[in-house]
Amino acid sequence: MITTLTTLFATLFDREQLLQQARSLHAIERLKKIHPADSVLALVRSAVGDERPSIATARRQFQALTGYRPEESSFYERLTPGLANLCWKTFLGALSKATHVQRREVARALGLKVRDIRAVDASVVSLPERAAKHLPSTDSRLGGFKITAALSLLEDLLVSAHITDARQHDRKAFGLPKDVEGVLWIHDRGYADHRLFAHIADGKGYFLIRLKSSSQPIVRSIRSGLAQCHLGKHLSRELPVHGVVDLDAEFTVGRNQTRVFRVVGIPVARNKQGRADWIWLATNLPESTPATTVGTFYRLRWMIETLFRALKGIGRFDEVPSGNPAVICAFIGSTLIGLVLSQAICVAMRVERPGSEPSLMRVFALVLSNLSDLAAAFHSHRLEAALEPFVAALWREGVNPNPGRPYARDRHLATVAA
């Protein structure tokens, strides 16, 4: 595990590589005493530290890392669009170096050859009113941005993150990548676009997307949960369904085309209004995948809510106090660097000890508290020795403190793999 972490931290701590990237991105004009690697580390610690993230906090973190306290104006001048791009590029570099772990037994539960299962969702973060000019919000008194993230459920890693202003609709903020083949995409109602269904299916991918109440396709065949006399009717929520519903329905795609996709209805004891209800899921998973398994896979979508809680709780995504778009983007990239490092460490822990339950929240906090010491050890070629107490702390403090109550992710994955 120490070898894995050495490679992982080298991505962030390689000063020469970061300096070359900074020059290519015009993040610096002259080196002087403020090295871009130290600036990025200071921003990461400021973004996910104990204090409110701000330029003043980042300046103090810079002093803690280097022993040098730059003038406020000098430090602020370094927070340029180039430095914001450097933070984002470093985040993408950490993303590409993350260790991958395939859960083949989960793929077998689907009865399909899938490369990955990805949950997509978005979360809105409020910003001060002075940011509204560049990042407008739905509230005219505030600015805001929306982060649209794709999370690999098999690898428990962030796959992509896209930033837009807060007014952007969920569907428009999500761009379907080219590598859809063999990937199961899980989305909430904000992405219930029939054209998206068709694009994923045409790309030889799979989808599992919750339907809006306004989506009422025509019932074409019924396997369970609805009487055959309702063939040819619109799938209205008033139809007399019972138990788990499994059927095929015809969707309108665009103006003139139609496509037939599978629809699964999963009963829930109580909805938000306290009444019995059904969750309706559109999918192109074949009939050989049981309807109950389809419902269990959709429950895994809540893993991405845990990711957003980590970003807003430990990363304090919603506490960026600036109206400067370069500063905002720098703090966003810095927070995501800390998150990806923490996720990759969790994956390495699962590889080292199969069956262990690392906690993203706890590991995130440990990364924060040890980041400066690990960076200093890397620069003095003592990283491997410094990693030994860090790894010991991970196993002591970074795992589920109550193994008798497994986390939802492990519980649901165990269910579908059984």
Regions found by a protein language model. Give the residues of each.
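Single, function-defining residue in the core of a domain
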Residues: 1-55, 61, 69-70, 75-77, ...
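Blade-loop segments of beta-propeller domains
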Residues: 66
